[in-house]
Amino acid sequence: MTGLGKRRPARSRSGVSGLRERRQPASVERSAGSEGRRELVIQGLAHDGRGVARDVDGKTVFVEGALPGERVQASVHRRRKRFDEAHVSEVIAASASRVAPPCRHYGSCGGCDLQHLSLEAQRDHKREVLRELLARQGIELPGASSLLADAGEGYRRRARIGVRVDSNGQVRLGFRARHSHRLVDLDDCPVLLPALSSLLRPLREQVESLEAPRHVGHLELLASDGAVTLVVRQLREHVADQRRWRAFAEAQGLHLGAWLGRESPRFEWLTPPPALHCRLTAGRRTLVLGLEPSDFLQANEAVNQRMVDTALSWLAPALSPVAPGTRVLDLFAGIGNFSLPLATQGAEVSAVEGSTAMVERLAGNAARNQVAVTARQADLNDAEACRRLLATTAPEVLVLDPPRSGAEALCRQLVEHPVPWVLYISCDPATLARDAAWLVSAGYVVRRSAVADMFAHTSHLESMLLLEHPDSARRQQGASTDG
């Protein structure tokens, strides 16, 4: 299931105990007969949610749909030099953590990969993934990671829906099948907000009614404060079909936009341009953040609020109301998800984004909420730009919320130019562990950790680390006392 907003590079799948899956040449065999079936005992769970076993020859086998402790009949569908890939054909002895999937499409739809595992066990697994990846870098957590979680269903407020028309003219609308570009036709999706899930069947009927359904590339859905926005990716403009889309949006009570054209698409509102926004709370304040359909917005509103609450709680000692004006540098700041709440606590916030349009949106959100945030643009993948930012802002607190590629350029700069406190919010624990290793090598100490279950029923996890540089913090305290 692909989200609406910031494009983040795809994660590579990872194994356990240091074994990481690598892309192999086409020396791959797809097995279908009984010679590809094996009885296996599952020893663990890989980071991507697959069971891990070893066959009679000691070769590692990754098994989709299998859980630790289970004995299964597995069908090998791909052989590689260092490991095989398989899927469960029969569960002989089931784990106590195995549950019935809440979605009837589970197993064919590729949007979720952990629905057969209880929600509690999913979250324990995600905590263990973070602990193990950090341990591989020699980093020990000070205690169990906090869990930031909410409902397991009906939580997702944005989604990209694929559209395909086959050679017989049949419309398929849904998400990609597992390991395939084929679409699984969906009438509902239990992880979507009900307001979005209920649109899947009407949307298919709408595409079927178009004169040129093959001109529809995909559909994007976004739920924001009491309204739903539909964005149509229209590969070729079609005036009659645009009229049909407007009528559909009016009947369903939707905001409607479209990306028009194939090579250099332009965005256009097909209904009156709305003032889209979402809300955050920061202490006693309610903040209203404006956004556009293409902006990055966390898919799970409730878990995002828990992450913001956690950031404010962890940083409270550094944001003492006795001494307001703590200098905070927020990098990859987006529309102000962390910048604005921190500013309400009296911090002097400088927020940085790579996109000029996003900087303007962030500045507008600060003005709308009457909080003092300085927004600026910089290339955060450029080491020299990162060095200049650290030098010119001299932050006491650094907040990082990078894409999946992480923030290695910046973390390398922090080795030479340490900041007393670093709050790192990550959507990929592997790049978080890599970057945290740079910081720990420079004297930083991990003080707090949390796992955010942003995408329940999937192996994806978000995490937070709070790191302190004790020497830098002491120097900062001394400077404040002298002042």
Swiss-Prot record:
GO terms for molecular function: 4 iron, 4 sulfur cluster binding; iron ion binding; RNA binding; rRNA (uridine-C5-)-methyltransferase activity. Residues 1-36 are annotated as: Disordered. Keywords: 4Fe-4S, Iron, Iron-sulfur, Metal-binding, Methyltransferase, rRNA processing, S-adenosyl-L-methionine, Transferase. S-adenosyl-L-methionine binds at Q298, F332, N337, E353, D379, D401. GO terms for biological process: rRNA base methylation. It catalyses: uridine(1939) in 23S rRNA + S-adenosyl-L-methionine = 5-methyluridine(1939) in 23S rRNA + S-adenosyl-L-homocysteine + H(+). It is an enzyme of class 2 (transferase). Its EC number is 2.1.1.190. Residues 1-11 have a biased composition (Basic residues). Pfam families: TRAM, tRNA_U5-meth_tr. The active site is at C427. Coiled coil: none annotated. Disulfide bonds: none annotated. [4Fe-4S] cluster binds at C103, C109, C112, C189. Residues 29-90 form the TRAM domain. Belongs to the class I-like SAM-binding methyltransferase superfamily. RNA M5U methyltransferase family. RlmD subfamily. Catalyzes the formation of 5-methyl-uridine at position 1939 (m5U1939) in 23S rRNA. This is 23S rRNA (uracil(1939)-C(5))-methyltransferase RlmD. It comes from Halomonas elongata (strain ATCC 33173 / DSM 2581 / NBRC 15536 / NCIMB 2198 / 1H9).
